[in-house]
Amino acid sequence: MKFELVKKVPIVELYGKKCFVDTGRSCVVESINPQIQRFFGISRLHVAGIGSLKRYTKFDYPNCEITTSDDPIPLEGGDAMPMEIRENCKWPGWLVKMTVGGVEGMYYIDTGAAFSYVHNLSTDFPPAGIADESSFDGRPWTAPMRRVPCEFAGHPFEILCGDARDNKARLDCCAVPPEGVIGYDFFANFTIVVDRIDGKMTFAARANF
């Protein structure tokens, strides 16, 4: 299915509803706060969580396409690696191993996050302006961003990243799991196929497209 990027978040038509796809939520399709609808500028917007996806899902941001299937989805030239799948828990989502700002760990990759957030972000990275954000209950807030180098499976890329702890202290609406969340910039740099059952990701770096 084709999607439209609105504020760096994929918007699709699903079950006859306009939805933004959020791999940080375990629901199928749910209604959302009217304030969030206003933030995106889309009336009657819903959220589609990972419960709406089948066993295999391909995210292809360069072509604005999401494919989900019960059958394996090929990715030509892709490499495979294990990933952690968490569903029906406090922090549902998908985690992969990467290095963010020199810190190696398991990080959530989240289609519902326009920007990335980690805890205790170093101020050594160059500032990159202010991001306009909205919490999931619809409260607007702003977040200072920094340009942070990352590496995933030997492939370098860069993200716009904020400090989750600082934002949570200023306005208690930045719900970021301890591992941190990597948003749009990951998907802009890698086309991926996720196997939710076996906990495996096949990926191709954008430089190889």
Language-model regions: role of each:
Residues 1-209:
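Pepsin/retropepsin-fold aspartyl endopeptidases
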